Amino acid sequence: MAEFLIEPRIRGFISLTSHPAGCAKNIDLQIERIRSENLPMGQKNGLQNVLVIGSSTGYGLGAALTACFGYGANVLGVCFERKPEGEKPGSAGWYNSARASETAAQDNLIFQTINGDAFSDDIKTQTIESIKKEYGKIDLVIYSLAAPRRDDGQGNVWNSVLKPIDQRYEGKSFDLRKESITDISIEPATADEILGTQKVMGGEDWQEWIELLAEQKLLADGARTVAFSYIGPEITQALYRNGTIGEAKKHLENTAIALDKVLGQTSNNTTGTVGGAWISVNKAVVTQASSAIPVVGLYMSILFRLLNERNENESTCCLLYTSPSPRDLSTSRMPSSA
């Protein structure tokens, strides 16, 4: 293979380049950390087949790695990543997924990925067929999608925006390209922008996935599902939690309540788990999505420094084993309001 130099290329808040060796090393370190926990593997943990929608970066990746290399589950991930072409590197998520699959195969574990738009009917169909042929009924569905747009398959293309509601937002941001702190001003969202953001980042697609799996009889008795959310510090409330994304998160949380009422009616006689739906609210993490939020980059740089000083800065893979165990999740119900 010819050698070539990979240099960072930044556009806005997104790095257009990633380093294959660096991504592989990152996955290796996460797997090493997971294995050091000596988690219960096999049927006794109630996790046999796990579907992770949004599996290539962030908390979705962390959950997928922990399910596979920690609990020994068969993992099927869905993500939308760019493949490498010649001297043009692929996206970090593509290399993450490739390394995870390679390592799983070496350890006689299953970590497979379907690469495509998780919102689309085509990818949903491919996923269903893969589950039928290679997995069997799903015990746990992790929903971890963050996207700029969604084609709902009904002729509508929705776009998500990061904007305040009813008032202009003024604050600080970090320019990655110039490596400088800048002042920003963002006008309030329109009604259409609020709705579009809800359609992309809310719970509608999550519910479609669960209903499709149920319709195809691919949810195990006592199946559970988890989606991720974030609250953020006070300094970001006007833009984030009280803005367009916050409205979408409220929709996501209300979707969890609706799904919980349905899934909570089933239980697994072997493991004793009761089905359900949960929202997992987590700490800030560096992703393309979080990098898009003004102020958050500055906030995270301070937060991580303090957490590191206290030895409390957990990686995304810690999520599934520092939370209640897969079986213990059945004892906690989704609150009536979130």
Spans of model-derived segments:
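The beta1-alpha1 cofactor-binding region of Rossmann-like NAD(H)/NADP(H)-dependent oxidoreductases
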Residues: 115-127
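Canonical Rossmann dinucleotide-binding motif of NAD(H)/NADP(H)-dependent dehydrogenases/reductases
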Residues: 45-78
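A glycine-rich helix->loop->beta "capping" turn
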Residues: 126-155
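Conserved small/polar residues in nucleotide/adenosyl-binding loops
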Residues: 321-328
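Glycine-rich phosphate-binding loop and adjoining beta1-alpha1-beta2 segment
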Residues: 79-110
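Catalytic loop of short-chain dehydrogenase/reductase
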Residues: 163-265, 286-294
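Class I SAM-dependent methyltransferase Rossmann-like catalytic core
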Residues: 5-35
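Structural signature of the Rossmann-like NAD(P)-dependent dehydrogenase/reductase core
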Residues: 52-53, 143-144, 223-230, 278-281
